[in-house]
Amino acid sequence: EYDKDEVRIVISGDLFESKNTVSNELMTFSSFFLRQLEEIAQVLVLAGNHDLVLDNTSRTDTLTALFDTANFDNCKFLDAMLGYTSGCIKDGNIIWAVYSIYDSYIRPDIDELKEEYPSCKIIGLYHGLVVGATMDNGSIIDGGTDSDAFNGCDCVMAGHIHKRQVLRRNGINIVYPGSLIQQRFGET
């Protein structure tokens, strides 16, 4: 037994696979899926590289289209809440530090919030590559975001890499949970 108001389900990007090639069935299924999750607990969604066309951000992305039409009760699109920029959202005793793909992951002002709310845990939300992470084919990432960008976070929930792993950097766990739905054998 749990209190539904004290639990969060986080989707760290790539709810969709097809960027902006969307069918009615995909929108119906995605809406149904998120509605099922929000019955369990509040759902927090972060955009990933497959949820938008990065080289043409003037086009409406798939998540914005879904959230603008679905009218969810207990599901939040964090990037949209922050005006499609990185930033922080206080949620009870948690501060969600959103590193938004829309502004190339500008580091949120974590230090100021840590002083203002010293008893809150700061959880970074990020969808991208972290230097030193392992891809599902075994290769090690040497480009991407340096883990120093997450200093001040108590932990980071990351998406993009489909291989489950925990990176321990500067005393901070950066967790890639793996794929929501397995796409290839290497994602197991």
Residue ranges and their predicted role:
Residues 9, 43-45, 96, 122, ...:
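Hydrophobic/aromatic residues located in beta-strands of well-ordered beta-sheets
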Residues 1-85, 149-153:
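Core catalytic region of metal-dependent phosphoesterases/phosphodiesterases
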